[in-house]
Amino acid sequence: MSRQRCALVMAGGTGGHIFPGLAVAEALRERGWRVHWLGGKGSAARPSMESQLVPPRGFSFETIDFSGVRGKGPVTLALLPLRLLKAFWQSVQVIRRVKPDVVVGLGGYIAFPAGMMSVLLGKPLVLHEQNSVAGMVNKVLASVADRVFTAFPDVLKKAEWVGNPLRPAFTRQLDPAVRFAQRRGPLKLLVVGGSLGATALNELVPKALALIPAASRPQVIHQSGARQLEALRANYQAAGVNAELTPFIEDTAQAFADADLIICRAGASTVTEIAAVGAAALFVPFPSAVDDHQTVNAKFLVAHGGGWLVQQRDLTPSILATMLQKTERLALVQSALQAKTMQKIDATSHLVAACEELAP
């Protein structure tokens, strides 16, 4: 009987890193691999997103203590060398215990110490960069990785553009023309703030909807983020608008397919998932995103007619209300069809193939 191969998947921080990692982890497991996940545990009061999402899916969950330094104070920066040494040592312990045949990094600061140690310990390293502007961790690790993949073109030298690893549900939705064919009445609006929510959208959208006559007002599903549900509920009550509110959407693919229009941030996973489903979207990039990468992500679709882009500073309740009232389904289905032409749906298979080629 052949030995079971093992992969150590490194990803953490936000859904933009975690969900592509889960797609790869699940595909490897289906092919008989033993998969361990390396992430951060967070704190008792604020556990990390990966610690909440990964263990319930049946993967062994390993942790080290490391987090980002951008925007932190001088004390955090001064302690960085000591924190790195600790994270390097913890990473070595994890790698020696797990004994992975391949290490797969999908971004987040947690991937840096373990990625470096995996190379020093002679483990093949496969990287995937989700954003159109590479993060600092992947910029460094790409120079020592065995294989590098990207979700967008021309992001890293010597990288292969394959799209984002997607959960299968995103590639199984009906074509936009079929979905839109029988739709009548008020628009179905989905507001998505990303895995952590979006305070600005939570405040702006209810005010915009209040400016639209109730008879023609869109039907709304609004994802708040785990810590913002009560504040969002108060915003809708103050605006006198009814909406379905949820902290988290479990079946995002179906929600995207059911919506006529999505108002959302422009994280890499969101943009590539919208392309895979073929959905119409108004992108409002997070203004504080590192290197303004969300704007670049959105432009990838918008430049080809696959959605609209408005900066947060330019979007007011009045402007959004006017846009929603003037938007017709014909324009939405055309946008959805254009978005779908930009899809790349085989990233997961590329990463799995690389793992199988590199495994000893």
UniProtKB/Swiss-Prot annotation:
Chief subcellular location: membrane
Keyword flag Flavoprotein: no
Gene Ontology terms: biological process: carbohydrate metabolic process; cell division; cell wall organization; lipid glycosylation; peptidoglycan biosynthetic process; regulation of cell shape
Record field: catalytic activity: di-trans,octa-cis-undecaprenyl diphospho-N-acetyl-alpha-D-muramoyl-L-alanyl-D-glutamyl-meso-2,6-diaminopimeloyl-D-alanyl-D-alanine + UDP-N-acetyl-alpha-D-glucosamine = di-trans,octa-cis-undecaprenyl diphospho-[N-acetyl-alpha-D-glucosaminyl-(1->4)]-N-acetyl-alpha-D-muramoyl-L-alanyl-D-glutamyl-meso-2,6-diaminopimeloyl-D-alanyl-D-alanine + UDP + H(+)
Taxonomic superkingdom: Bacteria
GO terms, molecular function: UDP-N-acetyl-D-glucosamine:N-acetylmuramoyl-L-alanyl-D-glutamyl-meso-2,6-diaminopimelyl-D-alanyl-D-alanine-diphosphoundecaprenol 4-beta-N-acetylglucosaminlytransferase activity; undecaprenyldiphospho-muramoylpentapeptide beta-N-acetylglucosaminyltransferase activity
Pfam family, one: Glyco_transf_28
Its job: Cell wall formation. Catalyzes the transfer of a GlcNAc subunit on undecaprenyl-pyrophosphoryl-MurNAc-pentapeptide (lipid intermediate I) to form undecaprenyl-pyrophosphoryl-MurNAc-(pentapeptide)GlcNAc (lipid intermediate II).
Cross-referenced PANTHER family: GLYCOSYLTRANSFERASE (PTHR21015:SF22), UDP-N-ACETYLGLUCOSAMINE--N-ACETYLMURAMYL-(PENTAPEPTIDE) PYROPHOSPHORYL-UNDECAPRENOL N-ACETYLGLUCOSAMINE TRANSFERASE 1 (PTHR21015)
Protein name: UDP-N-acetylglucosamine--N-acetylmuramyl-(pentapeptide) pyrophosphoryl-undecaprenol N-acetylglucosamine transferase
Organism encoding this protein: Polaromonas naphthalenivorans (strain CJ2)
Taxonomic path: Bacteria, Pseudomonadati, Pseudomonadota, Betaproteobacteria, Burkholderiales
Gene: murG
